[in-house]
Regions:
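PLP-dependent amino-acid enzyme catalytic core
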Residues: 1-299
Length: 299
């Protein structure tokens, strides 16, 4: 039975590429807009790729023993992906996160068997990170994933996402648009590609402006990610919270596609690019990191 999987880990990747014809026409895009639907991963986000790749890298490096405990400070999709992949592989996982994160995320990680330690909300992610580092310091069998610094993060896209895009388009890709979280998805295998990074307008650190509060989950961490390489990026576009959410809603209504808020930001940027005269007949691929269900209670 060739189409039967033996583990959820085998279901990560090979996500569909969808031509958003109605949305492109409605927004007068001269280019074809192709959405890489990462919410087709088993835990509904692009971070499933990163979670699995980080675990596999630890396995390949011989770092794991029967007492190994993976530790990560995260408030979002990476933690959920790690919880599911660790459950499938039989590993222990401890997640640290601020106490003011949504109950849905906390419950979902615990549902997969992860231990979730909540830190004071006033300490933000820095507090969660400090707690994770303390746990690793006290336990010689603990391994901290450090997604922002883990080479497996960009490798998940260099050897996965980007290859899939090139195969599915026959290499006919002119522009790649991605909202920037850890910046791993900006790693490509095509030197001729024009790469556009997207960040929140109120926290446009890639454009040299100060960090600030915003309402686009998963991106705009307030600092330049370690893997971000401006030599690989042709343009940085900043999108407002309202533009991101409005585009996500419009995509749902016109295409029946439940894209998340960061996907809305990336699509908004792609549609603006697609309206440029020189984009006529071009193909723009947009990374759609996750779906809207995880954010319905906060929009």
């Amino acid at each position: 039975m060739k189409n039967v999987y033996n583990s959820i880990t085998e279901m990560v990747g090979r996500t569909p590429l969808l031509s958003l014809n109605k949305l492109a026409k409605q927004c007068k895009s001269k280019a074809r807009i192709l959405g890489k639907c990462e919410f087709y991963n088993p835990l509904f986000s692009v971070k499933d790729r990163v979670a699995l790749k980080m675990i596999e890298a630890a396995e390949a490096g011989g770092e794991i023993n029967e007492n190994t405990v993976f530790v990560e400070a995260t408030s979002g999709n990476t933690g959920i992906g790690l919880a599911a992949m660790c459950a499938a592989k039989g590993y222990k996982l401890v997640i640290t996160m601020p106490e003011n994160m949504s109950q849905e995320r906390i419950m979902l990680m615990r549902h997969f068997g992860a231990e979730v330690i909540l830190t004071p909300k006033d300490d933000g992610m820095k507090g969660a990170l400090a707690k994770a580092e303390l746990l690793v310091e006290r336990n010689p069998d603990a391994i901290m994933m450090k997604q922002f610094y883990n080479e497996a993060n960009p490798d998940a896209h260099r050897f996965g996402t980007s290859i899939e895009i090139l195969e599915d388009t026959g290499g006919e890709v002119d522009v790649l648009v991605s909202a920037v979280g850890t910046s791993g998805t900006l790693i490509t295998n095509n030197p001729d590609l024009s790469v556009v990074a997207v960040e929140p307008k109120s926290s446009a650190v890639l454009n040299g402006r100060p960090a600030g509060a915003h309402k686009i989950p998963g991106i705009g961490a307030g600092f330049v990610p370690p893997f971000y390489n401006d030599n690989l990026v042709n343009e940085v576009m900043d999108i407002t919270d309202e533009e991101a959410l409005d585009t996500a809603r419009e995509t749902a209504k016109s295409e029946g596609l439940p894209v998340g808020i960061s996907a809305g930001a990336a699509l908004c940027a792609a549609l603006k690019i697609g309206q440029r005269p020189e984009m006529k007949g071009k193909n723009i691929v947009v990374i759609l990191p996750d779906a809207i269900e995880r954010y319905l209670s906060v929009i």
